[in-house]
Amino acid sequence: MALLSPPSPPPPLPPLRRRPASPTLLAVATRPSSLLSLPHCHCGLPLPSTANARAYSRSSRRRRRVAASLGQDEPGVSDTAVAPEGEGDSEPPASSDGAAGDIASSAEQPEASPEDLEDIRQVKRVLELLQKNRDMTFGEVKLTIMIEDPRDIERKRLLGIEDPDEITRDDLADALVEVNEGRIPENRVALQLLAKEMTEWPDLEMEAPKKKSKPGKSVYAKATDTGIDPETAAKRLNIDWDSAADLDDEEEEDDETEVPSAVGYSALYLLTAFPVIIGISVVLILFYNSLQ
């Protein structure tokens, strides 16, 4: 009896090979079809060819432009038609950033009230007076406005006052800059506080005392003999010799003070004689006690 051999296993199948899709086929698959934009009323008609679809999309766009220029909507034409990629002269969509910029630029600021205009005039008037009477520049005025009173800081710290909506010194400085640039500040509360503070500027109308422009001696030259000839100094400084020679006389006249004749050198002699008088008195008292 012959032994039966087991059946041999089937030969292994070769692995499947996947061919990548052609770029042309992918482009065709992803390209939107113009037939999707046809209205529902044309669904029963036979599908047109590619050339007819392109011609139909172009005519649809032309009809939409004519209807838009006349302010009418043409019935039966869909507004969501997708034109084939790379064809037609369709206009690019408007950018959202550009539209937002146009809206922001067209937004008008609230009109200024008469009180705001009066506050602006007050601030400009104070700036002119400070520049004329105090010789202060705009930067110096701005720095002065930004300085906060330390007493207010300590009071707020002790009372625990923390208001995030409170007008700060930086807000006042920003309002001052906008007024100086000829613009109306957006923060009207800061404008009112700025006008109130600047109108209360101390001694605003008073002019600053003008210093003498005539040159004088330094403190060291007054206390020490520098050995500088006034005539030589006058030639080097390009000033008149007479005015240079009169410097010492004028300064001496300013330093001298009028003293009454009764309080002259006699007071000095009297103070010096006090110890002598006391010594003589002590000697006389001791001598008188020794005689007893």
Swiss-Prot record:
GO terms for biological process: photosystem I assembly; response to photooxidative stress. It is a single-pass membrane protein. Residues 1-67 form a transit peptide. Residues 1-15 have a biased composition (Pro residues). It comes from the Eukaryota. The keyword Transmembrane helix applies. One of its GO terms (cellular component) is chloroplast thylakoid membrane. It is found in: Plastid, Chloroplast thylakoid membrane. Disulfide bonds: none annotated. The chain crosses the membrane at residues 267-287. Residues 1-119, 206-225 are annotated as: Disordered. Keywords: Chloroplast, Membrane, Plastid, Thylakoid, Transit peptide, Transmembrane, Transmembrane helix. Residues 49-58, 94-107 have a biased composition (Low complexity). The keyword Zinc does not apply. InterPro entries: CEST/Y3IP1 (IPR040340). PANTHER family: YCF3-INTERACTING PROTEIN 1, CHLOROPLASTIC. Involved in light-induced chloroplast development and growth. Involved in the plant response to abiotic and photooxidative stresses. May be involved in the suppression of photooxidative damage. Belongs to the Y3IP1/CEST family. This is Protein CHLOROPLAST ENHANCING STRESS TOLERANCE, chloroplastic. It comes from Oryza sativa subsp. indica (Rice). The lineage of its organism: Eukaryota, Viridiplantae, Streptophyta, Embryophyta, Tracheophyta.
